[in-house]
Amino acid sequence: MDKSKIRNFSIIAHIDHGKSTLADRILEITNTVSDHDMDDQFLDQMDLERERGITIKLNAVQIKYKDYVFHLIDTPGHVDFTYEVSRSLAASEGALLLVDATQGIEAQTLANVYLALENNLTIIPIINKIDLPSADIEATKNEIEEVIGLPTDNAVCISAKTGLNCEAVLAAIEKYIPAPKDADDSKPLKALIFDSYFDEYRGVVMLIRIFEGELKVGDEFMFMSNGQRYFVSELGVRSPKETKKKRLEAGEVGYVAATIRDAREVSVGDTITLVNRPAEKALPGYKKKKPVLYTGFYPIDTRDYMELKESLEKIALSDSSITWEQETSKALGFGFRVGFLGMLHMEILQERLNREYKIGIIATSPSVEYDVHMTDGSIKKISNPALLPDRTFIDHIDEPYIKAEILVPNEYIGNVMELCQNKRGIYINMDYIDANRSRLIYEMPLGEIIFDFFDRLKSLTKGYASFEYDLIGYKTSDLVKVDILLNGDKIDAFSIITHKDSAYSKARDLTQKLKEAIPRQNFEVPVQATIGSKIIARETIKAYRKDVTSKLHAADVSRYKKLLEKQKAGKKKMKMLGTVEVPQEAFLSILKTNIDKKK
């Protein structure tokens, strides 16, 4: 294969800027997919992606254009899936920067552009949705030049929806994106694993980009991180259906199967090389993104525990950003503490476990990881509020802080600043991008933004604001643990860590929500929120009242009183012996409720 005719590229875009639609048009124009087989969001193969209209998983497809071979590596746009984007960019030489002409640059787009620049990729600006009346092409070009510092001389203006000028995108890829560097088949094999998934028949299937050397069916290869060896059983490319090949060359993107049954042996970002002629040095791979959010996952049926563990291992093949470890809850039994990149990431995984693996789970209230400084000088990392030590042994608690960059229309600046203030944000800076939009910089506790910050930001600005954040370290805060007691018993799965100033309002919201979610029992159930031994909020779930006097004559007063006294005595006994049955909906309601009430 002529290496000068290979082009490897990704598409960078914010949600709803038309990335999946542009990918569809490229597949159509190049006849990679026939009209008969074509569906909207063709590369978004998961049902969840189609339902939500977002890309969750990266995808890779080989496209023939003239005498060129293009490898399109599709990427997600949501802030929670930045890790997927970084993996796609590591396997590319260039990127299409897709910007909506009606909305301009968004914060998440900026973050992904910086990732592309760090990888030394060639970036081609593509201005989309020019068919809409509100499109402002010149303003969008100016924004790309001023905000990103990227020249727009080679910018292509298109409508991915109608297909207008989409041919020019292919010509720009051919002209501006460089061919793979140092793509020499004769060198020792160096191939980057940028994704993987589990197949029931073939075992672990890896998506790879070959930088140097070649790989053939029957070759014995090894992972450079752990030295594990396997023989290639199947090779091929996706175009977009899997097409088997005898070999993959330097510069190509394809898949490899080797009947690997143990999912833990494959690590995304690892380098594979041949056993008989190994490479001296592994490829750089990429920096693993650390989870920012932790929650407990417990199977509804305790017999599904091992099945849940195996399912998490399989999902981790294609989503190596999740972490998990075993934990035990007095209320819920055996489960796992799972780490995520955000709330959407968590919801998607929960949905995948339910749909793909048929496992029903209960998720506890999410939390961030705190540094707990003990009075003896030691530091404990706590992500499960139930494990927070007694206050008498704690010197102080540090919580993670982020630097948030918010792009907002000028008319909504006041609303956004108030929201940040309510989230304990520290104002750092503000600058004007142009006459209509500004950039706000705030430092905020990570724990304040993981629940509902993104949704509230969108609702306060009618969907026009966007934000991106980076972790900047830990700061000491006045934090307390709020415990929930049901009928006097502490339910560890409901515990939360929060700032002292908002503890009372959050406790009221929690008790109120539990009162609504837990069905009435045959006895009265107090729902209490406590800090230490102090009760700070209480609700009562009223008991059912059985009408024991319904058969009596109205005049039979003594009998009437006797039956009521008997019922009262029976209820006291039930209250003493009874345990409260908490339905799954109670956990879901706490998870989905806006715990931080709008102030």
From Swiss-Prot:
It catalyses: GTP + H2O = GDP + phosphate + H(+). Residues 4-181 form the tr-type G domain. Coiled coil: none annotated. Keywords: Cell membrane, GTP-binding, Hydrolase, Membrane, Nucleotide-binding, Protein biosynthesis. GTP binds at residues 16-21, 128-131. SMART domains: EFG_C. InterPro entries: EF-4, EFG_III/V, EFG_V-like, EFTu-like_2, G_TR_CS, LepA_C_sf, LepA_CTD, LepA_IV. CDD domains: EF4_II (cd03699), EF4_III (cd16260), LepA (cd01890), lepA_C (cd03709). The keyword rRNA-binding does not apply. Its main location: membrane. Signal peptide: none annotated. Required for accurate and efficient protein synthesis under certain stress conditions. May act as a fidelity factor of the translation reaction, by catalyzing a one-codon backward translocation of tRNAs on improperly translocated ribosomes. Back-translocation proceeds from a post-translocation (POST) complex to a pre-translocation (PRE) complex, thus giving elongation factor G a second chance to translocate the tRNAs correctly. Binds to ribosomes in a GTP-dependent manner. Belongs to the TRAFAC class translation factor GTPase superfamily. Classic translation factor GTPase family. LepA subfamily. This is Elongation factor 4.
